[in-house]
Every structure is written in structure tokens, then in C-alpha cells.
Amino acid sequence: MKRRIAFTAALLIGSLTHTGHADAAGGRCKQYEPLLQTYAPRRGWDIGRMSRYMFRESRCTPHVRSRTQDTGLLQINDINLQYLTRKMGRPITVEALRDPSTNIAAAALLCTFWRNAGRSCYQPWAVN
């Protein structure tokens, strides 16, 4: 009986913390792919790859915050807030990064920064 209650509680907690929109079979965040497509042509992004990174980083949950100060769908780190504020022309805060459009736009700006530095756009999300 205790095991059944614990399992039910785990399912309930999981349903409260997950958006339920992820394509679990493909490990992608398909509902956010149109936003990724907005930035893909200018950044040379592979939509499927970025969608899989998004799934891995946040499980398609825009409000997620890690214990290492990473926020949102693509887990943008706080160390980038000043740079992003300067480049986007408006205050970019932790709360702002919880907005899917802002988070993906921020990732696109960081991609440009890394490419200009001769690095891969995918480097922050790649797994060694």
C-alpha cells in the first residue's frame, strides 16, 4: 500500500512540474520549433538538434531554473544577463528568460557571439 501511495504521489508531482507538451518518443520540444525556426535561418541552426537540446535541458518547461543559475528552455546562465540586456536593448532578467520567445532569442544572440569568437553555436549544449 505504501509503495502504491508513493508511486501515485510521484506521478502527481511529475505532472505538476512538467508541461506535458514534450514529444517524449522523439525527445523534442515540437511546440517550440516554430520559435526556433524564427532564428534558424540567421543562425544556421538545425531545428531538430536545437529542439533535442531544449528537451534535454528543460524537458520543454519554460520556467525551469537549475541550481547552477541556468533558466528557461535552453538554460541560459545568469552570467550572460548583462550582455543580453545590452544586446537586446531591454532588461533581461531571470524572469524574462522564462518567456520562451525571450529565451530562444537570447540563445540566438549567444550563438552569434560564440560564432564570432570562432566557436560552435552548439558548444554550450553539446555533451562530450
Language-model features, listed with the residues they occupy:
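N-terminal export and membrane-targeting signals
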Residues: 1-8
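Export/targeting segments at the very N-terminus of extracytoplasmic proteins
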Residues: 3, 13-60
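Residues in flexible loops and secondary-structure boundaries
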Residues: 9, 13, 82-84
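Catalytic and binding regions of secreted/periplasmic enzymes and modules that target cell-wall glycans
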Residues: 29, 42-43, 63, 67-128
